[in-house]
Amino acid sequence: MNYYAAPMEGLTDRIWRQAHQRWFGAPEAPVRYYAPFLSPPENRVLIKKKMAELAPEANPGAPVIPQLLAKDGELAAWMIGQLRALGYTEVNLNLGCPAGTVTAKGKGSGMLRDLAKVDAFLDGVFSRTEGPVSVKTRLGVTSPEEFEAILDLYDRYPICELTVHPRVMRQLYRGEADRAAFAKYLPHCRMPVCYNGDITTPAQLKALEAEFPNLSGIMVGRGIIADPALLRQAVGGAPASKEELRGYLDELYHSYTESFGMASCAVSRM
């Protein structure tokens, strides 16, 4: 089973990834980190500050998967090329973000309103790039039943892994992830599938693995922020000790203070 840390804007940056890997990375539960989404610039001029988050030297020892938020397939393919030049193999496409500021622009899960545009986007990406490209998605915009047509579309492309968050766009993060809908559509997925949504305890993660043994991976988000030893515990390891938590939080505090130049900003981030 592959384990992933979900991309969360303002939380899972390079400083957090390094601290988590150092204090809670475990050989028995190796984790790959999705970086918070990057939007390809329309003028194709890369912003150094944003790219610094993905510089290989800024992420030593922490396996990272960059994520793109875009709606232009040709532009996304260009950005994938830039990331591959940095040494990244897999790149993820974000078709799942439900934030209003994102969906209003027709990006993230907002793309799911128009499957013809999703088709054109994916064609623009896969016709111009080679190598592993994964997708993170929601079930639809207003109803889980929309996923039947969405999945049929995804199956036309060589997606290396499909991460499904079983909520619809309109839910944002309210209510519960629709595990029944996920179970309904999982047998029809032709590509490897990763589950994401409402995994906050080791017991929940182990139960999910037992219920869906054919998953290629499990992605945890808020759960791994609240309990950084979650994955380690899920494979039989120890909970976070007081010493580990103190060292982990001290590293975050000092690293953020150095990055922001102010201790108050570090505390706000934490």
What are these regions (language model features)?
Residues 1-270:
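Flavin-dependent oxidoreductase catalytic cores
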